[in-house]
Design a protein with these regions (language model features):
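Conserved AMP-binding/adenylate-forming
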Residues: 29, 44-88
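Conserved C-terminal "lid"/linker of ANL adenylate-forming enzymes
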Residues: 517-581
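Structural core segment of the AMP-binding/adenylate-forming
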Residues: 77-150, 476, 517
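Conserved pre-ATP/AMP-binding loop-to-beta segment of ANL
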Residues: 15-18, 146-177, 184, 205-212
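Gly/Ser/Thr-rich phosphate-binding loop
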Residues: 146-147, 151-152, 230, 261-263, ...
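Conserved AMP-binding A3 loop
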Residues: 30-34, 164-167, 173-197, 231
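Conserved ATP-binding/catalytic segment of the ANL
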Residues: 61, 376-447, 462, 473
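Conserved AMP-binding/adenylation subdomain of ANL enzymes
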Residues: 81, 195-213, 218-260
Length: 582
């Protein structure tokens, strides 16, 4: 079944209900379900008129907006494949992605097209569509488009394509990319059947009321909202950087549009909670808050509950290849669970969703797993409470990557069925709930035993003075890196003696152990050798919430190199002074 049929059904059931409310150029715009359906038939007509055929790939560089979903609906209707690449990864990354599945067309704004002209790979794409904001309700169409590009607004003048491609289960629909352990992009190709299964699982997981209003910050969730008849509000701003969103705008928008639910990154929701608490403001319309995409610590959940006291706050665990995997409501977290998290037990993410099969295998990340029988698989699984690698299988779990690139490191088979290796370490407790311990590749293992970073990050997250932390092995030493909050004046006072005159140019400060003994004692079980304080700990680009450990390693190396050269300079200077005295 073609995923577009669900949108067509909603246009018939609730034609005049708003499907998308967005704010191009800060102006409120409403697109109803029937308007979305009509625009989709026109966009499909434009693609067909341009010569695109079933199976052709359309590369999209377009932020969350009405235009994005009109384009997607037209693409799915015609049986084309939508390709998404993160432009923030650079032109080399884009070229690698396009080489794996060359697109026949690219859709982007005129501004983005000018930047893409720097890429020989993108210049070779035959068809180029230029999107301008306010295209949905534009009363006139520009008489010209930039050289070599076709104005997206002309879809309003093309003949409608009312029929949709009758998709088979395996027909491709959506192509995205994720980085493997080698750094080369892996292509995740989702079929119409996969998108249908994922929508069903997301809908069951969120259990939103048809006709309600949801603040949309994640593209795949908005697509599921449309299929379920839920109004999606897209806030103004760049949602690709959730940690930089305007919290005042979000709070105002939630109240003005009577938003009852949202699915968002911890970085976005933390900023919203900060703002509301500072302004002594609450969000009474919110009934459900779903938070995921990065580790969610108890302190964040507590603050959100204070801001939205009537809301059910739910943590969701998932990944690009399997979304969602597990969930837990904050009101289900007991005091004993919080104490376990503070004592190094990791992050509680709840019971696996019914649609997924989840198991814990011994942590052998980096080594391929050979095909095995069901009995061999069951014998290999870890006992309850034992930390290992999380593996999953299900209809909404990606069974393999395009051309098999990346399958060896992250896929294996049990009785012929595909299983996905998440690369995350965790364990199942006695109640069958999943606890996360961090990335398998980030584990610390030495003569003192094995420790995972999330255990330390979660424990320190409850301290008011610590905004963020990271735990890693560096030069055979267990190093704790902390980022302090702006309000932690007492800690800053203790560190005042080690701040350098040029601290604005050099971010990390090595903190004397004696000054941070309480911090070290808080995680005594981690046996920390050294504590360093950073002005900012590097985070992942996508959610702005997960510690970017490779970037942190590089920063530590640069900092150590700086001190090495500084030491050599001081040593040489002292030696020269000694010679002068003689």
């Amino acid at each position: 079944m073609n995923i577009i049929t669900l949108l067509t059904e909603q246009a018939q059931i609730r034609p005049h209900q708003p499907a998308i409310i967005d704010f191009p150029q800060r102006k409120r715009r409403v697109l109803t379900f029937v308007e979305l359906e009509q625009a989709a038939t026109h966009s499909a007509g434009l693609f067909q008129q341009s010569g695109l055929q079933v199976g052709d790939v359309v590369l999209i560089f377009q932020p969350m907006s009405a235009e994005l979903y009109i384009a997607l609906a037209g693409i799915f209707r015609l049986g084309l494949v939508a390709m998404f690449i993160d432009p923030g990864q650079g032109l080399r990354h884009i070229a690698q992605c396009c080489a794996s599945q060359p697109p026949k067309a690219v859709l982007a704004s005129n501004i983005v097209h000018r930047l893409l002209a720097l890429s020989p790979t993108l210049r070779r794409i035959p068809l180029k569509f230029a999107v301008e904001e306010l295209a949905v309700q534009a009363k006139s169409v520009p008489k010209f488009a930039p050289l070599g590009r076709r104005a997206w607004q002309t879809h309003r003048q093309t003949v409608q394509h009312p029929h949709y491609f009758s998709a088979q289960a395996s027909d491709p629909a959506l192509l995205t990319f994720t980085s493997g352990s080698t750094g080369h992009p892996k292509a995740a190709l989702r079929s119409h059947d996969f998108l249908m299964s994922q929508h069903q699982v997301i809908a069951e997981c969120l259990a939103l009321t048809t006709g309600s209003v949801s603040l949309a910050t994640m593209p795949i969730v908005l697509l599921s909202n449309l299929a379920q008849g839920i109004t999606s509000v897209i806030p103004a701003g760049d949602l690709r950087s959730p940690g930089k969103t305007d919290p005042a705008l979000l709070a105002t928008l939630i109240q003005a549009e009577n938003v009852s639910s949202t699915v968002a990154s911890p970085a976005l929701l933390e900023r919203l909670a900060d703002y509301c608490q500072t302004q002594q403001q609450t969000l009474p319309s919110l009934c459900k808050i779903f938070i995921g995409g990065a580790p969610v610590f108890p302190k964040t959940l507590q603050r959100l509950q204070q801001v939205a006291s009537h809301a059910e706050i739910v943590t969701i665990y998932g990944s690009t290849e399997a979304e969602p995997m597990a969930k837990i409501a904050f009101n289900q977290v007991q005091m004993a669970d919080v104490q376990a998290m503070l004592a190094g037990g990791g992050v509680l993410v709840g019971v696996p969703v019914p649609a997924i099969r989840l198991a814990i295998l011994p942590d052998r990340w980096g080594k391929p797993l050979l095909p095995m029988s069901q009995s061999e698989f069951e014998c290999l699984q870890c006992s309850r409470g034992v930390v290992g690698e999380i593996v999953v299988s299900g209809a909404h779990v990606l069974s393999g990557y395009l051309h098999g690139k990346g399958d060896a490191e992250s896929k294996f088979r049990v009785n012929g069925s595909s299983w996905h290796r998440t690369g995350d370490a965790g364990y199942l407790d006695g109640q069958g709930r999943l606890w996360l311990m961090g990335r398998c590749s980030a584990r610390l293992q030495d003569e003192r035993g094995k420790t995972y970073p999330f255990a330390v990050e979660c424990a320190l997250s409850q301290l008011p003075a610590v905004q963020r932390s990271a735990f890693l092995s560096h030069n055979a030493r267990r190093v704790l890196v902390v980022q302090i909050t702006d309000a932690s004046a007492s800690l800053c006072e203790r560190l005042k003696g080690v701040l350098f005159p040029f601290r604005k140019r050099v971010q990390p400060i090595i903190a004397p152990t004696l000054d941070l003994t309480k911090l070290k004692a808080w995680v005594a079980w981690a046996q920390v050798d050294e504590i360093r304080v950073f002005k900012h700990i590097p985070l992942d680009v996508r959610h702005n919430a997960k510690v970017d450990y490779p970037a942190l390693y590089k920063r530590l190396e640069r900092w150590d190199g700086f001190f090495h050269h500084l030491g050599c300079f001081i040593g040489g200077f002292k030696h020269a002074l000694g010679l002068l005295k003689h």
